[in-house]
């Protein structure tokens, strides 16, 4: 019988394609009794092109690979120092619509940043989370058979310069930000637990369990 427990995997630094394949496999294999999972991971440098992605938004990738993804949205960059959180949730079971999940993820990041003194907000016209006009977190989701995968990417203490090689999320001149511009001692190690605590709170504090990678 299904129990409302979320399994949390802290996966460290991983290549994007291997984790993407694992997400697909998990989503394809899961059934109505499978636990929901949250994966916390950082990726080696990679540009990922979303389903709606247009090639003209990849300006000069250089030595960084470009990988096609089936998440929503346009091109973005992942690299070390960016906390990625993948949400593998049975939305039907949790009575969440897609828009509800987007709002929940944005609020997770807003609440996490508020705890460390950074005022952030979502934008109606461009998904993600912003500090002033600068984008600090990107979102991209896919829903299959009522279950979500992919998730969010929060810039913590990463090198932002690769974002200059693309139009982030399809917006020319979109300025990116990272947490260490306001909070110098931020690392993925001290941000990940806050991010997890905040998403669990918004999911009504289900029991959770860390699973060894």
From Swiss-Prot:
In the reaction, the free carboxyl group of octanoic acid is attached via an amide linkage to the epsilon-amino group of a specific lysine residue of lipoyl domains of lipoate-dependent enzymes. This is Octanoyltransferase. HAMAP family: LipB. GO terms for cellular component: cytoplasm. Pathway: Protein modification; protein lipoylation via endogenous pathway; protein N(6)-(lipoyl)lysine from octanoyl-[acyl-carrier-protein]: step 1/2. Residues 32-207 form the BPL/LPL catalytic domain. It is found in: Cytoplasm. The record marks 135 as: Lowers pKa of active site Cys. The lineage of its organism: Bacteria, Pseudomonadati, Pseudomonadota, Gammaproteobacteria, Enterobacterales. Its EC number is 2.3.1.181. The active site is at 169 (acyl-thioester intermediate). CDD domains: LipB. The gene is lipB.
């Amino acid at each position: 019988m299904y129990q409302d427990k979320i399994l949390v995997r802290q996966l460290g630094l991983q290549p994007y394609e291997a984790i993407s394949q694992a997400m697909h496999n998990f989503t394809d294999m899961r059934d109505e009794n499978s636990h929901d999972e949250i994966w916390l991971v950082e990726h080696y440098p990679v540009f990922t092109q979303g389903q709606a992605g247009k090639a003209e938004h990849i300006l000069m990738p250089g030595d960084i690979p470009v990988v096609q993804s089936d998440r929503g949205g346009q091109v973005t960059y992942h690299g070390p120092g960016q906390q990625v959180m993948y949400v593998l949730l049975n939305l039907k079971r949790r009575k969440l619509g897609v828009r509800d999940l987007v709002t929940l993820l944005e609020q997770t990041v807003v609440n996490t940043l508020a705890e460390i003194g950074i005022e952030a907000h979502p934008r109606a016209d461009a998904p993600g989370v912003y500090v002033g006009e600068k984008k600090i977190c990107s979102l991209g989701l896919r829903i299959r058979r009522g279950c979500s995968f992919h998730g969010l990417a929060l810039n913590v203490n990463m090198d932002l310069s690769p974002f200059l090689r693309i139009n982030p999320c399809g917006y020319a001149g979109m300025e990116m930000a990272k947490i260490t511009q306001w909070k110098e001692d931020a690392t993925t190690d001290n941000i990940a637990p806050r991010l997890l605590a905040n998403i669990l709170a918004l999911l009504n504090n289900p029991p959770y369990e860390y699973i060894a990678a």
